[in-house]
Amino acid sequence: MGRVLQKKKNRSSAPKQKPKRSGQLKSGKKKINVLGNAIIAENWDRKLTLTQNYCRLGLVHRLNAPSGGSEKRVTKDGSIEEVPEDSLHIKGSATASAKQAAMGETRVERDPETGKIIRVIHDDDEIVVGGRKLKKSNPLNDPLNDLSDDESAGIQSQPRSKSTSAIVQQLERQADQEGQAVKSKKPRHQSKREEEWITRLIERHGENYSAMARDRKLNPMQQSEGDLKRRIRKWKASHSA
């Protein structure tokens, strides 16, 4: 027979206490360590939000286009700072088509018998692909096409703050150093036990890799035929040198 207090607890509608999970927010989402990088942690301002810090450092915290507008900050002289539009943001098809649509005249070629439209004749700079009006220079409607054109025209020479430029350059140098370290990583050498195991396999089966893969005694871990080929090729290269 259970205790009366325990029965009351079971019938109570009060939420039961759950053990606190480390690295998890109250909303249940995983807590992200934004200060994992030493350069970002050194230049992080705890008085600002994550978005404000990323904008100040010259980084982007979200690749999607903003859905609710952008924050307008007041400068020292009292004017409102205008945030430039990011050319890498991919806009929705409805918004893009509404902005690109313009009033104009076109010529239509019809079938003399049925009266159906055969061909729509536009200006030289525009064509119709799949019922959509596209530029000849960008028939796939690639949003990065305009960016490449702007870069060739000198968009890379836009002025940026020295602190932002320095931080981004430090991060790029760090990423380049880590990439070089991965490339220059020393290859794994086979141990003596592995070389002895490969020698026994070759002595018994020769070049028959399928028989090696099926051998339960010499190949208890059931290494695949392709894996055995790579190991034996590496063993031969080390012994031929």
Curated annotation (Swiss-Prot):
GO terms for biological process: ribosomal large subunit biogenesis; rRNA processing. The keyword Nucleus applies. InterPro entries: Ribosome_biogenesis_Nop16. Residues 208-218 have a biased composition (Basic and acidic residues). It is found in: Nucleus, Nucleolus. Keywords: Nucleus, Ribonucleoprotein, Ribosome biogenesis, rRNA processing. Residues 137-146 have a biased composition (Low complexity). Residues 154-172 have a biased composition (Polar residues). It comes from the Eukaryota. Residues 230-241 have a biased composition (Basic residues). It holds the Pfam family Nop16. GO terms for cellular component: nucleolus; preribosome, large subunit precursor. Residues 1-29, 92-111, 132-196, 208-241 are annotated as: Disordered. The keyword Nucleus applies. Involved in the biogenesis of the 60S ribosomal subunit. Component of the pre-66S ribosomal particle. Belongs to the NOP16 family. PANTHER family: HSPC111 PROTEIN-RELATED, NUCLEOLAR PROTEIN 16. This is Nucleolar protein 16. It comes from Aspergillus clavatus (strain ATCC 1007 / CBS 513.65 / DSM 816 / NCTC 3887 / NRRL 1 / QM 1276 / 107).
